[in-house]
């Protein structure tokens, strides 16, 4: 079996790109898989230097769609199946190249994402454009929450996985804080993700403002297309009184994330929308207790009070953080329960096997063409309490 992964980029990073790259490397241990994507500068670009990765051209919109389409046509006869990894570049490129059979993976809802960036009128436009691109191909999503949003396309659920071995030998807290440049003493919060409005970092800023003994690390780039660094500057201007306690470290390489997690006491994730957040999975795998926003995908992962905590607003988030900060035994028990849950249910091996099973069924013709349905089809287990 030969499979071609088709994605937008690797170099810029982001949880979804890293999660799909992890699936790509995992599958290479079982079948022949190559990755075709666009070239983008970023701290993660060195990940694309492994065998099997090919650039079709630079990451520019909309020209990048044409680059990918041409590259797909050139190699189309060499592959048994095509795995589409993003809705903006690889999906229209594979559609135009008539690459079949193909599977489509969504780790976000592009209809909502476009609406946030460009306004509700673009949300409606995206809905119209997306329908013919997705219809007739198996759609895979990485959470029940996304499956509910795409119900009419009969989505199949393959939960995101994390390479738990990356978190088996973490440095000590003291060594990690020295490495990231944060002095010991205060309770240290950490969040990982791009500094963009959907991450709702004002909640984190409010938590730090309300708890004088707390500092925070924000690990993620704060310049992004469309947003530039406007959101980052707005945060700095809105919270001048806590600038010395909130450290924006920018984008770091994938292998540096475990050290930043090891330096912290509590992981905070106030995002307003996610698919299956890779950052949260990695925080739980590292053994950190987590306090996250109460949104559907987080409810799939978190059993409130046991594997983490769900907060409905910044005041509740601050209260939960304060409780954890004052009770080391609670931090330990919640962090351990979260780590055990991820290791038992959300390993990268389980995710890889689910994709392998999907591909075998698709090539064998066992999966019918997409048609409206009432319930999503589940290929891997979800957490429902």
PLM region descriptions:
Residues 272:
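Aromatic "clamp/platform" in nucleotide-sugar-dependent glycosyltransferases that forms part
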Residues 121-138, 235:
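Membrane-proximal helix-turn-helix segments that form the acceptor-binding/catalytic region
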Residues 44-48, 215-245, 256:
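Short, structured helix-loop element that forms part of the nucleotide-activated donor/catalytic region
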Residues 103-121, 222:
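A short, histidine- and acid-enriched strand-loop-helix "catalytic/donor-clamping" loop
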Residues 84-90, 109:
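Short His-centered aromatic/hydrophobic patch
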Residues 280, 289-292:
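Short hydrophobic beta-strand element within catalytic cores of glycosyltransferases
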Residues 4-5, 183-199, 205-209, 217-219:
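Conserved donor-binding/catalytic core segment of Leloir-type glycosyltransferases
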Residues 303-315, 323-329:
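Conserved acidic donor-binding segment of nucleotide-sugar-dependent glycosyltransferases
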């Amino acid at each position: 079996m030969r499979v071609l992964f088709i994605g937008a980029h690797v170099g810029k990073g982001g949880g979804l790109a890293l999660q799909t790259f992890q699936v790509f490397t995992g599958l290479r241990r079982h079948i022949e898989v190559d990755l075709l994507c666009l070239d983008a500068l970023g701290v993660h670009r060195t990940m694309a230097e492994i065998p099997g990765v090919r650039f079709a051209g630079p990451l520019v919109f909309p020209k990048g769609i044409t680059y990918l389409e041409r590259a797909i046509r050139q190699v189309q006869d060499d592959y048994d199946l095509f795995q589409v990894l993003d809705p903006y570049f690889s999906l229209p490129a594979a559609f135009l190249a008539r690459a079949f059979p193909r599977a489509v993976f969504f780790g976000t809802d592009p209809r909502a994402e476009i609406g946030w960036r460009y306004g509700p009128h673009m949300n409606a436009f995206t809905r119209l454009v997306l329908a013919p691109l997705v219809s007739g191909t198996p759609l895979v999503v990485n959470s029940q929450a996304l499956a509910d949003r795409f119900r009419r396309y009969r989505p199949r659920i393959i939960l995101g996985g994390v390479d738990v071995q990356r978190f088996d030998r973490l440095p000590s807290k003291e060594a990690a804080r020295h490495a990231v440049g944060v002095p010991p003493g205060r309770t240290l919060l950490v969040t990982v993700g791009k500094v963009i409005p959907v991450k709702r970092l004002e909640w984190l800023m409010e938590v730090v403002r309300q708890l004088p003994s707390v500092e925070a690390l924000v690990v993620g780039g704060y310049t992004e297309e469309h947003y530039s660094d406007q959101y980052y500057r707005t945060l700095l201007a809105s919270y001048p009184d806590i600038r010395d306690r909130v450290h924006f470290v920018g984008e770091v390489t994938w292998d540096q994330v475990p050290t930043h997690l090891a330096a912290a006491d509590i992981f905070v994730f106030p995002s307003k929308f996610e698919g299956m957040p890779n950052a949260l999975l990695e925080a739980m795998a590292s053994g950190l207790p987590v306090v996250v926003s109460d949104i559907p995908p987080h409810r799939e992962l978190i059993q409130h009070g046991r594997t983490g905590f769900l907060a409905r607003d910044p005041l509740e988030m601050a209260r939960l953080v304060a409780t954890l900060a004052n009770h080391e035994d609670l931090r330990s028990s919640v962090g351990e329960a979260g780590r055990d849950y991820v290791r038992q249910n959300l390993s990268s091996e389980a995710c890889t096997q689910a994709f392998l099973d999907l591909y075998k069924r698709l090539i064998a013709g066992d999966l019918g063409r997409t048609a409206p349905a009432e319930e999503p089809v589940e290929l891997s287990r979800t957490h429902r309490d």
